[in-house]
Amino acid sequence: MTFLKKNLVYVILLVVVLIFALVKPLREFVSDQFGMTATVDKVVAESSFADEDFDVDLKGMNVPDAKLSDYKGQIVFLNFWGTWCAPCRTEWPSIEALYKSKNQKVKFVLIAMQDKEEAVKKFLEENKYTAPVYIAQSPLTPKMLPDVFPTTYVIGRNLQILKKEDSTLDWNSADSQAFIDSVSK
């Protein structure tokens, strides 16, 4: 009994290691969650959108209606926001400034989420914002659907994700301007 007491930690550790080694589903779960086994195909799929992700009808709030697929083959600044979202509202002046300086190089698509048309139009008019704003009229794919607001993607001509930002950012900063310049050449 004294052997067991002295070595209890080692015995428990041995049992845990044996369980992981012998129970295949548990081993696969741990490997999937913590393992570094990404394949090139998986990395590419996770760092780019597919054609079906762009199959979204958009109702224009301050521009004509469009389809997200209209922007394939171009550099796209895609922002998900809401008038109800304080960080989104904080970010807007920098997005508007970026839009005014870079709209010849990049297509801007700002999608208001969980919002009413009247609230979006009022927000744009009160602040004199001109960046193109839409409300999605068809469901977004799980890959495109944001987890937090604001979420912004800069998407390349081949639907690759060049940048993803899950928080407020000063889009008019020198770094952001330089990034947009570098990807839009």
Which role does the model predict for each range below?
Residues K72, F80-A97:
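Conserved redox-active cysteine motifs that mediate thiol-disulfide chemistry
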Residues R89-N127, I135-K143, A178:
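Structural microenvironment flanking redox-active thiols in thiol-disulfide oxidoreductases
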Residues M1-D53:
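N-terminal targeting signals for export/organelle localization
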Residues A50, D55-V76:
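A short beta-strand-turn-helix
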Residues K72-Q74, Q104, Y129-T130, P146-D147:
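Active-site acidic short loop of glycosyltransferases
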Residues F77-W81, A112:
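Structural cue for short, hydrophobic secondary-structure segments
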Residues K122-Y129, I135-V183:
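Thiol/disulfide oxidoreductase modules built on the thioredoxin-like
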